[in-house]
Amino acid sequence: MEAIKQIRPQAEMRYREELDALAAADAENRRPLGWKLSPRAVRDFILGRSKPLEYQGRQVTITKKYLGNDALVERCIITLTGSRGLMLVGDPGTAKTMLSELLSAAISGVSTNTVQGTAGTTEDMIKYSWNYALLLAQGPSRQALVPSPLYTGMERGILTRFEEITRT
């Protein structure tokens, strides 16, 4: 049987070595509760560094991944340090999804916790829903609950990305 090929791996997999090198170099720096990297290291991950980092006996270059406005990235990071929501608004093709994926990978270590908005997105897709067979058999229980990405984000303390929120 042929293995399934991924079109594009998640940011945390694609840039694993860079994230690991930044985490090792960043170990002494302060970071907001639940963050994998300090705000400075998150900035370096997205906007790149001029000097490579020494990691496991090798030089690791932190590449620039976002080719837009550096000040925008810094404002996004500052907003997220305050435990506030961040909404990126712009024309199609302006790297909003890419930036949110990079921020999630650097801050939470997970970029796939996403609610995909559509015209058919319902409240239970955002909060949680129930496995009705288990609900009838056991009553309301944790096993019968089907967590949404938002529920998972709140439970694990990771970022939740909403894609195409205007289409809901």
Labelled PLM ranges:
Residues E2-T168:
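AAA+ P-loop NTPase catalytic core and its hallmark functional loops
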